[in-house]
């Protein structure tokens, strides 16, 4: 078994002083733009600090020298899709509830991709901005767990597989495979054989797990016309994919959407094309939300307590910050609530 790699070490003022050949007080004066050192020394100190990758500590800027702990959360998703995603709104609500009770801050940032997310972690680490992070949207071949372990940042992975991505990280997960199997069971019992899953972003661990489960359930039942199509989670792509499917030679009799926003857009697109829900096509949304009960027909949906999901993740991170061990915590399987948007298949098999 390979030896555990020591966390990367942040450069300090002592390192700068040693490299520049000056005292630590001179380094402090130079970096804080205070009088007491010559311009030549100030320039040399700043040059060395840049070479070493030094960044000022947020806590060091505060009068007391000891700031409250801060938790970081970076989301690499399209900003327009994220703004209407009820899952993240509820998840963050649960996270913030726990952090507020502990007087902890939340530093939140939206980025365009996982490379940018990794760059944020490196910057936060170098600047002492966060004491731990919550990692969302686990990915296939995910570079983030290894990076966070290298940096020595405590982390909790939200979602993903039951196996922790790294020994020092906690994982909070739900059984997406079991939830997908339950949806297929329900639709199959209603007579549906042409089922299409309008999935989220490709490469996300939960997206791939849902796709694999759907494929396995279809093979088990001998259903060749069951498939998944990936999207960016937006209403625009949800509607566009729905139109393309329903305008095809053999439209599906049931659609499973990976979030509520795409499901709503899909129902609207179906209506525009003259497909009634659930008469001509049944619809299931992966995430239940109040939106699912604000339209006619009310949407059948997979329901879970997403706020509690966020609370659990935040509690696990605070436990790590308190010196507790890494754990794997399973939350309840999302439960299918059958409403008005699913019904018996009326299309020819």
Question: What is the role of each PLM region?
Answer:
Residues 1-69, 346-349:
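N-terminal helix-turn-helix DNA-binding module of bacterial transcription factors
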Residues 6, 226, 244, 248-349:
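Flexible loop/turn connectors
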Residues 23, 69, 131, 193-194, ...:
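Short acidic/polar active-site loop segments enriched in Thr and Asp
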Residues 54-120:
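Amphipathic helical "hinge" segments at domain boundaries
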Residues 78-90, 108-117, 172-182, 198-241, ...:
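Hinge/beta->alpha junction and helix N-cap segments in small-molecule ligand-binding domains
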Residues 117-129, 239-249:
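Short, well-structured alpha-helical segments in soluble
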Residues 136-178, 261, 287-299:
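Flexible loop/hinge segments that line or gate small-molecule binding clefts
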């Amino acid at each position: 078994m390979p030896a555990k790699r020591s966390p990367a070490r942040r450069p300090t003022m002592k390192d700068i002083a040693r490299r520049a050949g000056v005292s630590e007080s001179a380094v402090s004066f130079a970096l804080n733009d205070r009088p007491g050192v010559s311009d030549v020394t100030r320039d040399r100190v700043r040059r060395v600090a840049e070479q070493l990758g030094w960044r000022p500590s947020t806590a060091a800027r505060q009068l007391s020298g000891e700031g409250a702990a801060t938790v970081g959360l970076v989301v690499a998703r399209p900003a327009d899709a994220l703004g209407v995603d009820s899952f993240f709104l509820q998840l963050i609500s649960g996270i913030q509830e726990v952090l507020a009770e502990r007087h902890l801050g939340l530093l939140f940032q939206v980025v365009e991709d996982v490379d940018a997310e990794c760059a944020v972690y490196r910057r936060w680490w170098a600047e002492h901005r966060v004491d731990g992070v919550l990692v969302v949207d686990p990915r296939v071949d995910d570079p983030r767990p290894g990076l966070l372990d290298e940096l020595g940042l405590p982390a909790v992975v939200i979602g993903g597989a039951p196996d922790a991505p790294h020994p020092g990280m906690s994982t909070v997960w739900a059984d997406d495979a079991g939830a997908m199997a339950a949806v297929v069971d329900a639709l199959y019992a209603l007579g549906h054989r042409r089922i299409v899953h309008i999935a989220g972003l490709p490469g996300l661990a939960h997206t791939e797990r849902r796709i694999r489960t759907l494929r396995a359930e279809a093979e088990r039942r001998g259903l060749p016309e069951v498939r998944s199509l990936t999207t960016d989670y937006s209403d625009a792509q949800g509607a566009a994919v729905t139109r393309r499917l329903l305008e095809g030679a053999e439209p599906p009799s049931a659609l499973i959407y990976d979030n509520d926003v795409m499901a709503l857009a899909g129902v609207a697109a179906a209506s525009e094309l003259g497909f009634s829900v659930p008469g001509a096509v049944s619809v299931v949304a992966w995430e239940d939300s109040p939106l699912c009960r604000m339209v006619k027909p009310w949407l059948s949906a997979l329901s879970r307590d997403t706020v509690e999901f966020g609370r659990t993740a935040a509690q696990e991170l605070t436990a790590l910050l308190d010196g507790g061990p890494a754990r794997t915590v399973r939350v309840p399987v999302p439960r299918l609530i059958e409403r008005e948007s699913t019904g018996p298949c009326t299309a020819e098999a």
